[in-house]
Structure formats: C-alpha cells, structure tokens
Amino acid sequence: MTAFKIENETIADGFYACPAVYEDAESITGLLVRTAEWLRDRGSNQWSGLLKGQDIHDITGSIEKGHVFVFKKDEELAAVVMLLPAPSEWDRTLWGDDGHEESIYLHRLAVSRRFAGQGLGARVLQWAETGIHFPEKTRIRLDCVADSDALHSFYRRMGYEFMGADASGYHLFEKEITAE
C-alpha cells in the first residue's frame, strides 16, 4: 500500500475524496469507458483502448495498491483520478530516466458527465496538488494526447508547465508542489 495522507477530504460543496475500494472498480471502469466514448464522439482517440477492453493502467490492481481516488457526492461517483507514487513502464517510456524519485504520476482523471461544467476537474487536480500528501514528492507529472488543445490549455491554466512532446504523440506536463 502506498504511503499518503489525505489532508482534505472535502473538495467542493458536498463532494468528498477518498481512496477507491474494490467495490468501486465496476463504477470506475464504467465512468472511464463512458468518458472514452465521449472523447471518441468528439474526435479524440484518447483512452480508445478502454473501448476495446484494454486497461493499460490496471484499474483493479491500482485500487488494491491504493493509487486510485474517487470523488463522490451523496455516494454517487462524480470523478476519479489515479496517482502513482512511482512511474509505470508507460511513464518511464514517456519521461525517460530523470526525476522519478520526487514525482507523482497523474492518470485517468475523469469527471462524470452528470457533474461536468461545474469546475470539478479543476478541483480534483487541485486536490491532487494540496489535498493529499505523498512524502518526499515535489512534483506532479501527467501526459495527454498531443491533439487536444482544450486539454493543454486547461493544464496550463492550472499552472502546469509544458515539458515537451514525445515521438508517439503525447504532451508532457508537470507542476511543482510542496513537499514536507
């Protein structure tokens, strides 16, 4: 199990954060697949593997390791995020060999369409920065498809620095956070 401390369980009016449990796996997978369908319908291939039954981030295994966090309102799943305290093989491929010891890797941030348009994605991202503490971690890293200008703008507005693009079509972003 990963060492972390949730500093703030409440992220917005009635929304709260908690580690995902095994019983959440089906609803999380459903949310991720619905998000992938929504992205596909808008011309994006981001997360398209989920539509083929591929789960490169192993949601169930990641839940068991304590890497997945859910955001609920009145017990309804509103959003999800995966925070890896060590790089996956995917992350090592994208980021190379440097900076892993002090980095958290953010994956699979998704908001239920029912709660879209309320700033929940930004609040989840802010929570990942300040609402949870991973000892000795001083930055968050994330990647996204290169062809999503809206997503790139969102991350920049949230204070993430564009670190470059890799040859396979992903843009890399990171943000310094406070470690104690």
UniProtKB/Swiss-Prot annotation:
SUPFAM superfamilies linked to this entry: Acyl-CoA N-acyltransferases (Nat) (SSF55729)
EC numbers on record: 2.3.1.-
Keyword Ribosomal protein included in the entry's annotation: no
Pfam families (alphabetical): Acetyltransf_1
GO molecular function: acyltransferase activity, transferring groups other than amino-acyl groups
EC main group: transferase
Domain annotation N-acetyltransferase: ranges: 31-180
Coiled-coil annotated spans: none
Keywords: Acyltransferase, Transferase
PANTHER family xrefs: AMINOALKYLPHOSPHONATE N-ACETYLTRANSFERASE-RELATED, AMINOALKYLPHOSPHONATE N-ACETYLTRANSFERASE-RELATED-RELATED
Family: Belongs to the acetyltransferase family.
Protein name, UniProt field: Uncharacterized N-acetyltransferase YesJ
